[in-house]
Design a protein with these regions (language model features):
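Second-shell loop/turn segments in exported
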Residues: 3, 40-44, 84-85, 97
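Soluble non-cytosolic domains of exported or imported proteins
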Residues: 3-8, 29-33, 48, 85-93, ...
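Periplasmic-binding protein-like
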Residues: 59-96, 118-143
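Ligand-binding clefts/hinges and TM-proximal coupling segments of bilobed small-molecule sensing domains
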Residues: 8-17, 99-152
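Bilobed "Venus flytrap"/periplasmic-binding protein-like clamshell domains
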Residues: 1-36, 51-55
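A ligand-binding cleft/hinge motif common to bilobed small-molecule-binding domains
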Residues: 12-17, 40-41, 45-76, 115
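Short, solvent-exposed alpha-helical surface patches in well-structured domains
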Residues: 56, 93-94, 110-111
């Protein structure tokens, strides 16, 4: 299996390999393109990476129908965040309110659909990744928790 060097994905794969005694040969690739090429050219049987990144590589490949992304999660979701000044609660309150309004008001769904379920310029690629239940749940009730378990 291949994954991109320096990512949390290769770290998680390595940890699971050891903890579960899977005996997987893990190949670190220098970047996502090299990792995908290794699967494309049969030098690796699978590529472990974030589903959206995999979807974009598949959509841009020569034969998108030759690939599938597993539905089973390899790990807990990793929350993304917005970095802001630590000691500015007034600004954090404004950011929290603005993002909550975006998520709960339906605009986030429109933005998501634009980039993940429709053709994207300039090449017209469609990632065909409908919003998952965990993200829908998070949009309905936004949180700033860094705990992956809070996103189930």
């Amino acid at each position: 299996m291949v994954s991109t060097a320096g990512t949390t994905n290769i770290k998680q794969l390595t940890e699971a390999n050891g903890a579960r005694s899977l005996n997987i040969n893990i190949i670190p690739a220098k970047d996502h393109a090299e990792a995908f090429l290794m699967v494309e050219t049969d030098r690796a049987v699978a590529f472990v990476m974030d589903d959206i990144l995999l979807a974009s590589l598949i959509a841009g490949s020569k034969a998108p129908d030759d690939y599938v992304i597993s539905k089973d999660a390899f790990s807990k979701p990793e929350p993304y965040g917005i970095m802001l000044r630590k000691d500015d609660p007034a600004f954090k309150k404004v950011v929290d309110a603005a993002t909550a309004a975006l998520y709960t008001g339906g605009e986030a769904q429109k933005i998501y659909d634009k980039w993940f379920t429709q053709k994207i310029p300039p090449k017209g690629l469609n990632l065909n990744v409908p919003m998952g239940s965990e993200l829908k749940s998070e949009f309905a009730k936004p949180s700033d928790s860094p705990d992956p378990d809070s996103y189930k």
